[in-house]
Amino acid sequence: MESTPSRGLNRVHLQCRNLQEFLGGLSPGVLDRLYGHPATCLAVFRELPSLAKNWVMRMLFLEQPLPQAAVALWVKKEFSKAQEESTGLLSGLRIWHTQLLPGGLQGLILNPIFRQNLRIALLGGGKAWSDDTSQLGPDKHARDVPSLDKYAEERWEVVLHFMVGSPSAAVSQDLAQLLSQAGLMKSTEPGEPPCITSAGFQFLLLDTPAQLWYFMLQYLQTAQSRGMDLVEILSFLFQLSFSTLGKDYSVEGMSDSLLNFLQHLREFGLVFQRKRKSRRYYPTRLAINLSSGVSGAGGTVHQPGFIVVETNYRLYAYTESELQIALIALFSEMLYRFPNMVVAQVTRESVQQAIASGITAQQIIHFLRTRAHPVMLKQTPVLPPTITDQIRLWELERDRLRFTEGVLYNQFLSQVDFELLLAHARELGVLVFENSAKRLMVVTPAGHSDVKRFWKRQKHSS
């Protein structure tokens, strides 16, 4: 996923990038180094389309290139589009490349590094992907699968609570900085805690696997600037995805950079490590599902609805989730809180405050609609039109004025002088505003020097 500008101030839309798109943007040298790890090759192979997988398996044990024409005959003409997509994908990921055959024909051959390590991953052999923990003995504080799932959920929820401004949620400085670099949060004033952005609000609407994938993409994009080896940490992530849930792994042999990365994964909830200096760790379900869930990244949360909205702008949320309550508080005023329900009021001030932070009216409406209580789903439309229309109007009300910097010219001695300078500013394309009756005009700061120079020449010549 990437944040891309949209219409209006501070409006962005999250775009999802899957594993193939991310790897396709890496340099050939980085890709070849990545393919030096069997876990990476297997993870990439697993995410390929079925046609591309078929080609790779048919060529996996061939040491000589095949003619391109022969490979093309493997696919029927009606599947030419899928053939074109798979061909481009395998070339873009450097899984295969062209090679000139005797006689001048073009041939195709698998990348030898990828071929060798995919064989190892599929058939066994090579070095162990992780160090054995048998030398450490049995873990006195072993974790079972339910406790790992609970730990991962709690750790990730701390990150989400921090994004919505929950005072009880605290994260490391590295994580807070990463959230800002990713465009999910921003600092309004020096010394003030960061607040959520439009992109951050969209981020919270995604399901957990999509959130984690987007977040890890941002982490990887800034890894090298933090002095980390991108290939090393990517290979470790792929290695984690093939781990066994509930099994412990040793940190022996890890570099300092990788140990630091492990602490970040610990904060995200991807691994459990009892203490920072503990010699073993447990991958959680979030880490194991990370790369396999990439292709589905970008979906919104699918959960039972719990919000009822009335035409009087009252909002009733039947939930105990602190995160959902904090999300509702971003665009409404909290009135009452009960053990399993909160009551809030959607007001002009609360909506415009949310819009000032970069949250759009459409995002608020989408949030309410996707979390609507089953009772509301029975009516058409789901949300009262008076509510949706008013939220959009409050947004338009805030956006109706556009501020443009400029330089004012007034106090002209004659209408002729005014029209002469006005025509010159219009010709240069720097005119912002004019009022002929009052003989005043405004030009852009960039065009001010040219207009001023022209006016001085006219005064001297007259």
Curated annotation (Swiss-Prot):
Molecular function, one GO term: double-stranded DNA binding
Question: Can you say where in the cell this protein is located?
Answer: Nucleus
Q: Which GO terms describe its biological process?
A: DNA repair; nucleotide-excision repair; transcription by RNA polymerase II
Please verify whether the record's keywords include Transcription: yes
Q: What keywords tag this UniProt record?
A: DNA damage, DNA repair, Nucleus, Transcription, Transcription regulation
Claim: Translocase is one of the keywords in the record: no
A GO-annotated cellular component: nucleoplasm
Main localisation: nucleus
Stored Pfam families: Tfb2 (PF03849), Tfb2_C (PF18307)
The family this protein is said to belong to? Belongs to the TFB2 family.
Functional summary from the UniProt entry: Component of the general transcription and DNA repair factor IIH (TFIIH) core complex, which is involved in general and transcription-coupled nucleotide excision repair (NER) of damaged DNA and, when complexed to CAK, in RNA transcription by RNA polymerase II. In NER, TFIIH acts by opening DNA around the lesion to allow the excision of the damaged oligonucleotide and its replacement by a new DNA fragment. In transcription, TFIIH has an essential role in transcription initiation. Stimulates the ATPase activity of TFIIH subunit XPB/ERCC3.
PANTHER family assigned: GENERAL TRANSCRIPTION FACTOR IIH SUBUNIT 4, TFIIH, POLYPEPTIDE 4
The Swiss-Prot or TrEMBL note on domains reads: The C-terminus (residues 305-462) stimulates the ATPase activity of XPB/ERCC3.
Question: NCBIfam families per the record?
Answer: tfb2
What's the subunit arrangement here? Component of the 7-subunit TFIIH core complex composed of XPB/ERCC3, XPD/ERCC2, GTF2H1, GTF2H2, GTF2H3, GTF2H4 and GTF2H5, which is active in NER. The core complex associates with the 3-subunit CDK-activating kinase (CAK) module composed of CCNH/cyclin H, CDK7 and MNAT1 to form the 10-subunit holoenzyme (holo-TFIIH) active in transcription.
This chain's protein is named General transcription factor IIH subunit 4
- The source organism is Homo sapiens
